[in-house]
Amino acid sequence: MQTYGSRNVDYGWWAGNSRFADRTGLWLAAHVAQASFIVLWAGAITLFEVARYTPSIPMGEQGLILIPHLAALGIGVGAGGVVVNTFPYTAIGAVHLISSFVFAFGAIFHVRFGPESIGEGSDSKFAFSWDDPKQLGLILGHHLLLLGLGAIFFVGWIRFHGVYDSTIGDVRIVSNPGATILSVIFEYGWFTPEHNPFFVNNLEDLASGHAFIGVVLLSGGVWHITQEPFAWAQRLLASLFSAEGLLSSALAGLSMLGFAAAYFSAVNTLAYPIEFFGPPLELQFNIMPYFVDSVDLPAGVYSARAWLCNVHFYLAFFVLQGHLWHAIRAIGFDFKKVSNAFATLSN
């Protein structure tokens, strides 16, 4: 994991997956276990929100963060954004809980019965080392395929089931979800006037955007699975071909997505309808920037939009610090030299 000095470092429990950097079988088990916790959280919080949901109070003022997303997907809601059936929310929460147990079993299985390194198993296709660009590209490609399938699934959902359209106040389908894809590429893609992607205001463009991104991700997945990184790319991105380098790049991506999600959820009322998330937010500054509700709410009450936006913003900020830390270490800088330098000055 460490890219400078001694590479044989014994990490404590607090170091997370760093302990398994050279034991890819346990690395896989750790990822499956983390997926279990994420899905467990999603299921448990969904059921918790169903239990406390009050139809007489606007959804956006109840401190809910998961049910509003389900409602925006057109699940359990009717005209005017009125929740007509909460059973789908309960069912979705229960499915997530059950799925988390399946993931947990998979993690335990890989710890107890799986090989310590993936290459020792019956299927060594995904065996890798941190300095092997070809295998790392193969794994990246499969990640991109899964992301692309997720985007295409949303296109299918909006085509056959429909989502809530805040411009008409009802659930509707988009019969031709790729009809405006040229607008997405040449207008939203270049932030032309009245085509800021953060302010997309119709479902046709939202669907076409997902279709375009889905195709890009799937194409990228196929490319990285079949094509080893070019020599110039390996030289340019040499610091990435290490455990710490890949961690830093992953954190950079998470940070970028977090900032984008924070601003998008703060200002967009199509993907985040006012009926479910509350009105758009206002940006204010103190020690750090933060977003506040633009309407008066009871003391101690914040809209779902405020919760989502600010949590994404601050998580993205701290993840960015993690990226910088690990990126600097990945290029070989030893932070211990800083403390040693201060110690020398004090003496």
Swiss-Prot record:
InterPro entries: PS_antenna-like, PS_II_antenna-like_sf
Cross-referenced SUPFAM superfamilies: Photosystem II antenna protein-like (SSF161077)
GO molecular function, one term: chlorophyll binding
Membrane topology: Multi-pass membrane protein
UniProt remark on cofactor binding: Chlorophyll a.
Entry's transmembrane regions: 25-45, 64-84, 91-111, 206-226, 247-267, 308-328
Protein family membership: Belongs to the PsbB/PsbC family. IsiA/Pcb subfamily.
Function in brief: The antenna complex functions as a light receptor, it captures and delivers excitation energy to photosystems II and I. The Prochlorales pcb genes are not related to higher plant LHCs.
Protein name: Chlorophyll a/b light-harvesting protein PcbB
UniProt source species: Prochlorothrix hollandica
